[in-house]
Amino acid sequence: MATWNRPHPRLPVAPEPVAEGESQQPLGRELSEANRFAYAALCGISLSQLFPEPEQSSFCSEFVTGLVKWLHLSETVLPTMMAFASGLGGKGDDIFAQTLLKDPILKDNPSAISQDLLSFSLKDGHYDARARVLVCHVISLLQVPMEELDILEEVFLESLKDAKEEESETAEESRKRKEKRRKWKRYLLIGLATVGGGTVIGVTGGLAAPLVAAGAATIIGSAGAAALGSVAGIAVMTSLFGAAGAGLTGYKMKKRVGAIEEFMFLPLTDGKQLHITIAITGWLGSGRYRTFNAPWMALARSQEQYCLAWEAKYLMELGNALETILSGLANMVAQEALKYTVLSGIVAALTLPASLLSVANVIDNPWGVCLHRSAEVGKHLAHILLSRQQGRRPVTLIGFSLGARVIYFCLQEMAQEQDCQGIIEDVVLLGAPVEGDPKYWEPFRNVVSGRIINGYCRGDWLLSFVYRTSSVQLRVAGLQPVLLQDRRMENVDLSSVVNGHLDYAKKMDVILKAVGIRTKPGWSEKGLPLAPGGLPQEEPLQPATVSTDETIHQDEQKQGPAPGDSLKSAIPSSASQAQVPAGLDQSTEDSLPAAAAPAEGHLVCSHGVGPNPLGCPDCTRETQESCAELD
């Protein structure tokens, strides 16, 4: 829905400050009546397209009703707008968007609609995830860069901070930028004040209300500042950012909850934002990957980001087991790969190499323990989010391996509650050891407002091995697409990026870019910060394949992907990459024998996956279905 990697966004054009004594009203009301109608109709039709589920109908109706009043439209147009929100308006959103762009006010500054719609969405002190998804959709129709929404949200926060930024010595450009921001602060706050002296909505969180009100007096006048310092204003700020503004950093598990021994949020950034991101690590390794925040150093989804610290002792045991099994079996697996190239049918029938089964006890116990605990942690996370510990603002969840499993069970738990809507904006599950059957993902449509991203790798033999030794599930989301028929569902084939399960931690920067999540500039593909001008000289990676549910469904009906198919496995160009467990450390990979690289011309299965010790996941599923007696 949003494109995050855009260079140097421009600041929105700031309107001239309103002179003292002049009437102040939201920008939307300054449009002509016809364009106010087009504005409301655009939002109504967009809501029907984004949230057609019956469970979302009340939100759509309330949003449209409030918007009609916000724009001072006649009540006679309300039935028409309700019809649009119910899906009776067809797909005419682009027509209304083009009509708006012809308005004299918006012709040179289409981002003004973003400001007005954001002001309306925040007027009650709540920032519903569905409202943010709608704002993103509308500004994309108006061809406004998504970065401008981030700037607008940032300006809303800055507008109520009583902090005077010092001008740098290089300064003219910085000074002009700040002047533009000051103009926007004042203009945006007009939209946050109700005509007639109603409550002004503050969105700072964690700041003393009287101090904030004092700083705001110079921007919005003494009357508005008095309202901001009132009990109602403080209540709204608390609602948006959580109790006492502490948010997630203020949460600590006071006592053991069920089987959970450790659960806390660690800040990845120092900033505040109107939407937050929570990253969840799947295991703890050795060296630089022994901390929870190590894989997420390049993440830049929002200015307020956290990582979840959970069950460190058990995740460390799991990480050690993963590294042990990989380093100890490197030579054996490489040789087994050659042996089973021709006998892939036997392997697909779950007749695993005896040498693999002999070391299963190394990984089975810590893996089984973490499988259970990740489910409990996910349920606990769901209750925290449902209690609005983070405040009333959108949340994005990103996790890999067992961290993705935490997200899966969090969504599953939230889906059972009636008030689960409007909290989660996007979720990203990478290499998830969870059920891939779409019937298990269907309830998530009621929880997630934006995107449900499933990043998978068909050749992840380690995930195939460890998960199938502890579960009878044959369709694993981390190994293949989830065929959920919904606009939210996005499947991203990471086979060209992820060579082994441990790559999810080691190549997180590249993976985030592949799934469309913004990252910090100046980070190498291995997750290491780069010195200026120190870009690594590497061969470009093949782009990961992004597929929608419709494309996948068509592909499933074929015998195998043809060269021109829209969905195809992004397998490495070198056959050796499909053979050698690439999750190994570099030192281990260098010591692999020459036999690890199979000869050219080995057969590739009908699903496009080269031979590996466990065979193709799809082949395994097909064979297992025909041999149900095998366990």
Swiss-Prot record:
It comes from the Eukaryota. The gene is Tmco4. The chain crosses the membrane at residues 187-203, 204-220, 228-248, 343-363. Residues 571-590 have a biased composition (Polar residues). Residues 1-26, 523-631 are annotated as: Disordered. It is found in: Membrane. GO terms for cellular component: membrane. Keywords: Coiled coil, Membrane, Transmembrane, Transmembrane helix. Belongs to the TMCO4 family. Residues 153-183 form a coiled coil. Its main location: membrane. It comes from Rattus norvegicus. It is a multi-pass membrane protein. This is Transmembrane and coiled-coil domain-containing protein 4.
